[in-house]
Amino acid sequence: MDKFRVQGPTRLAGEVTISGAKNAALPILFAALLAEEPVEIQNVPKLRDIDTTMKLLGQLGARVERNGSVHVDASNVNVFCAPYDLVKTMRASIWALGPLVARFGQGQVSLPGGCAIGARPVDLHIYGLEQLGAQIVLEEGYVKATVDGRLKGAHIVMDKVSVGATVTIMSAATLAEGTTIIENAAREPEIVDTANFLNTLGAKISGAGSDKITIEGVARLGGGVYRVVPDRIETGTFLVAAAVSRGQIICRNTRPDTLDAVLAKLREAGAEIEIGEDWISLDMHGKRPKAVTVRTSPHPGFPTDMQAQFSLLNLVAEGTGVITETIFENRFMHVPELIRMGAQAEIESNTVICHGVDKLSGAQVMATDLRASASLVLAGCIAEGVTIVDRIYHIDRGYDRIEDKLRALGANIERVKEHE
């Protein structure tokens, strides 16, 4: 397993180009299974989860290639089962189920793996597909869905806001007979992006981005070209990198309008922020950030995927900050690691109380999930001495060349291959 070796402290400064959003590219790639003609998807990040998805689509019989863009031709899909060996590394595989059953009347997906944060059952996906008329059984570790003829439109009320299940229902409903309404739908920008992609192929989806999405079923989807939205979490991570190191940054090829809650908290922490149509600049003017109070909630609230980075910000800020996690349980696994670097914090159930310290010290730490590991790498950039971050395969699942981008900002970071 690779490690990162980071030598600090560094004040990060410069420009970074933001990659496409993992959380939009994944559902869009799976939704390409619905199309009977070739699609071209631009701005897809280079990540392990993307590679796994492309491999999975290939195993289902799609032609998939990458040359700048990702090209998917699902016209000859003839296998309807997503096997355990690919699914086990990535929860997103469940997104194959809706498109398979909607277009081919059958689909099966092994129960998924992915980050070890909290309970993320597939129940809501299953509930949604059953409402659309699919018969679903769980056997031998697989979720198996079938339908006679086409799925039927339905009025579906989600009892919990779920990005994953909203994607599943919306994708499957594009080919259902009649109209589907999803109430209490997730409102994330990645949902909007997936809907825009499907509409490009001929779907009739309206209301994405609100809590009520309407899908008028169509008989088939064609081909098209689509560009994935920039990654708001990668953007936020690099903005925090500059903020905690008292530096400055310009993020290019991003979408400021997807980051309102994060930008508001960074301003509260004392950052000077300017925005343009596709760029954000942040300047700390050499000052230490001020502690902020953060409560995660579904979009447009403060994103859970930025919680670990703001934990770090509070741990090196002036004052005491409180962070409350309302989305996932067990999502403070980075905090004990940061305490080993000299941070001061107490965890009380779903809240972490952060007492800002003036400096952190390098240590050997372990990545536990995707966003937590990013915060450990940023901690290494600002800590005195050497930090070794172990198990960085988590980072490779969600950040496109993070070490290259940090190096361009002045970080002293290298990837150490296990055999060295």
UniProtKB/Swiss-Prot annotation:
It is found in: Cytoplasm. This is UDP-N-acetylglucosamine 1-carboxyvinyltransferase. Cell wall formation. Adds enolpyruvyl to UDP-N-acetylglucosamine. It is an enzyme of class 2 (transferase). One of its GO terms (biological process) is peptidoglycan biosynthetic process. The gene is murA. Its main location: cytoplasm. It catalyses: phosphoenolpyruvate + UDP-N-acetyl-alpha-D-glucosamine = UDP-N-acetyl-3-O-(1-carboxyvinyl)-alpha-D-glucosamine + phosphate. Pathway: Cell wall biogenesis; peptidoglycan biosynthesis. GO terms for molecular function: UDP-N-acetylglucosamine 1-carboxyvinyltransferase activity. PANTHER family: UDP-N-ACETYLGLUCOSAMINE 1-CARBOXYVINYLTRANSFERASE.
